[in-house]
């Protein structure tokens, strides 16, 4: 009764009885290469006819043999040995059932863990990688946009710098021309100053000559006056003598003629001296006026050149200041651009590290999942093996045995061994190729081993 109850409960738990016992082995190998991982999973199973059939056949033959040749004197000893064997088998079955229950609990726990890890892996595949990839792409687009903007700004600043450089070069050339013109004006001014100095010296010389001539005229006039005075005195003395001497000739007309001649000569000399002085003074005045006008024009041009030079110097200083400020701004922009580019590069490296870490984490989860799957498959194989063993044992236990001799049991075991030796073996080789944590190829190969 207990045997039937255990059989029905086993059928409710594991299904109908199997008439074939499966012996399976499992092995897994992984070959890794850069960027590619190959997993090779091998299954070997052996199927044969259940030993219970051989046992039933041997039991039938033993029954016929026992009915024909059984010695009733040994029945009690055989029954006692059979009861002891049944007790030992029950204890072993209880131990096997306990181990089987623990294996079932462990398998359930591992299946739950496998489901959790599978859900996490699917979530990471569905959301994590896409979210990180989208963030990476958005960040890269933003960085590229900023880099393009900075490149455009740098190009515009370089164009402005080139334009300012051209303006500075043009102003420098203009400054050189103005400086040459200033040097020419200064040379002209120096020549004009030399002419003015020469004219001044000539004027001073003429003034001295005029003074000397005036002094000479004054001296001659004084001398003339003195001579006239002497002549008048002589004339008076002679007039007195003439008055006293009646017979002396009349000298008045001669003196008058001499006086007129001297007066005419003196007036002519004075007039010529005045005309010569006036002409010389006019020439000197005209030369001085002309030279003063040239000096005034030269001074005016020099002042104009000085003002232009000052304005150009101010413009040059302003342009130098503008150029210096633009160069400082350009250096600051280049420094900021270098700093931002290095920051963007660090961000890119950090994002690549995050992506690499995420891929490594996914690969690690895949490896764990693969390991758990391997463990699950090994446990499934072991459970199937235990199930087949339990089915065989339960079938053997529930089969009614009459009182048998030890000879019949030995013969039945001898019949089972050849049957076990004649098992056919099948090897299943499953190859899985992964790259960056994703399965890219999967193949299965079956081989039969004798």
Curated annotation (Swiss-Prot):
Residues 118-139 are annotated as: Linker 1. Expressed in low amounts in retina, optic nerve, brain, and spinal cord and in very high amounts in eye lens. GO terms for biological process: intermediate filament organization. Residues 140-231 are annotated as: Coil 1B. Residues 394-450 are annotated as: Tail. It comes from the Eukaryota. It holds the Pfam family Filament. One of the most prominent phosphoproteins in various cells of mesenchymal origin. Phosphorylation is enhanced during cell division, at which time vimentin filaments are significantly reorganized. Keywords: Coiled coil, Intermediate filament. Residues 82-117 are annotated as: Coil 1A. InterPro entries: IF_conserved, IF_rod_dom, Intermed_filament_DNA-bd, Intermediate_filament. Residues 232-254 are annotated as: Linker 12. Residues 24-56 are annotated as: Disordered. Residues 24-38 have a biased composition (Polar residues). PANTHER family: GLIAL FIBRILLARY ACIDIC PROTEIN (PTHR45652), VIMENTIN (PTHR45652:SF5). Homomer. This is Vimentin beta. The lineage of its organism: Eukaryota, Metazoa, Chordata, Craniata, Vertebrata.
């Amino acid at each position: 009764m207990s045997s039937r109850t255990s059989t029905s409960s086993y059928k409710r738990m594991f299904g109908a009885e199997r008439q074939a016992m499966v012996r399976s082995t499992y092995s897994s190998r992984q070959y890794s290469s850069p960027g590619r991982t190959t997993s090779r999973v091998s299954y070997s199973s052996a199927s044969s006819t259940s030993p219970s059939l051989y046992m039933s056949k041997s039991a039938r033959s033993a029954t016929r043999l026992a009915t024909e040749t059984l010695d009733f004197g040994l029945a009690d000893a055989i029954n006692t040995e059979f009861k002891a064997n049944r007790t030992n088998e029950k204890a072993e079955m209880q131990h096997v059932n306990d181990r089987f229950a623990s294996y079932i609990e462990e398998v359930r726990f591992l299946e739950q863990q496998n489901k959790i890890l599978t859900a996490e892996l699917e979530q990471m595949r569905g959301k994590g990688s896409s979210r990180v990839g989208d963030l990476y792409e958005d960040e890269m687009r933003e960085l590229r946009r900023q880099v393009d903007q900075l490149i455009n700004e740098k190009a515009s600043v370089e164009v402005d710098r080139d334009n300012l450089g051209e303006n500075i070069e043009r102003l420098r050339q203009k400054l050189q021309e103005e400086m040459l013109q200033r040097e020419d004006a200064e040379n002209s001014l120096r020549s004009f100053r030399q002419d003015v100095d020469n004219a001044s010296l000539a004027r001073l010389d003429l003034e001295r000559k005029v003074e000397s001539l005036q002094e000479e005229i004054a001296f001659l006039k004084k001398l003339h006056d003195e001579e006239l005075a002497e002549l008048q005195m002589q004339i008076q003395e002679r007039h007195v003598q003439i008055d006293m001497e009646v017979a002396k000739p009349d000298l008045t007309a001669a003196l008058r003629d001499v006086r007129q001649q001297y007066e005419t000569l003196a007036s002519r000399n004075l007039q010529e001296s005045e005309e010569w002085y006036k002409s010389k003074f006019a020439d000197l005045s005209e030369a001085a006026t002309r030279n003063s006008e040239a000096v005034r024009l030269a001074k005016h041009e020099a002042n104009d050149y000085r003002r232009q030079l000052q304005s150009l110097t101010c413009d040059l200083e302003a342009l130098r200041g503008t150029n210096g400020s633009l160069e400082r701004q350009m250096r600051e922009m280049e420094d900021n651009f270098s700093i931002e580019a290095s920051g963007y590069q660090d961000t890119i490296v950090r994002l690549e590290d995050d992506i690499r870490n995420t891929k490594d984490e996914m690969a690690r989860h895949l490896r764990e999942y693969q390991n758990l799957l391997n463990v699950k498959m090994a446990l499934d194989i072991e459970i199937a093996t235990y199930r087949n063993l339990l089915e065989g044992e339960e079938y053997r236990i529930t089969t009614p045995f009459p009182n048998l001799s030890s000879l019949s049991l030995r013969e039945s075991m001898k019949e089972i061994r050849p049957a076990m030796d004649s098992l056919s073996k099948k090897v299943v080789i499953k190859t899985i190729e992964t790259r960056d944590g994703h399965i890219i190829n999967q193949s299965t190969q079956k081989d039969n081993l004798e």
